[in-house]
Amino acid sequence: MLDVQWNQWPETLIVFLKWRLTCSKGEHLPETAGDKCMDKTPTLLQKGLAEMFGTGVLVLIGPGSIPAALLLINGGNGKAVFTMADLGFIGLAFAVAIAAMVYTIGHISGCHINPAVTLAFAVTKRIAWNEAAVYIIAQFIGGILGALGIALIFGASAASTIGFGPTNFSEAVTSYPQAIAIEALGTFLLLMVIMGTAVDGRAPAGWAGLIIGLIVAGEVIVMGPITGPSLNPARTFGPAILQVLFGGSYNLTHLIVYFVGPIIGGILGVVFYDFLTRARAATASKAAQNLQEASA
């Protein structure tokens, strides 16, 4: 704290108030006070570690809720049929994990915790490609670490019984193109919501984590019986790989669906949102120009 002498308290109070004001604005005073603000710009390493942590928590809680549900339904004796209530609670687990991470690491890395989000932002030049590469590597590592957490909780033997929660689909019911289209649609909707609540500066402050979590929960309920859904390559990759490594079974060719679909859908979602916002800006500009010409 500041070294206050009673005969200097007015000046000290002014310095302290300026320090608090600059901290709240994310600015810095000179070394005497500004170095006390905990808002320094994160390094790329810090951002990568935040993405790894966030993705790990997402996988631990989201996919981790699936073996938890199976354990309660049938005592861990294999597959079971989920009810809408089961899907609802699994969706809620994803929503809680996403909201918690948005509010925890959003100010550090932006809380992508999803390679499809990072790639979409890189393609639309919202993040540099070298930074995107670090994010994506960190996200996949985080997905693996999250799956290791699931193995720690339920035991390695769970890989061959209740599994580690990777997304999957039945080829007898759903073709690869249909599964890719479903994943693309789901990720398209997710990115539209992310853009509208977290990226667009006109969005109400403080709601992004909750709303993004809720759209994922809704998609889990609707698309869960068909493809999972994944909406996130790292979310599926970690549990799938660890499930196989620990003696369980998983058709790794299904990863094609959970990579291609989210990447396509994510890019389309950002591009479409940009189109919508540019269209509004162009319309407003044209209206202002017409008004100016009419008043001339």
Language model feature labels by segment:
Residues 16-19, 23-296:
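Membrane-interface helix-loop junctions and terminal tails of multi-pass membrane proteins
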Residues 9-10, 33:
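Compositionally biased, low-complexity intrinsically disordered regions
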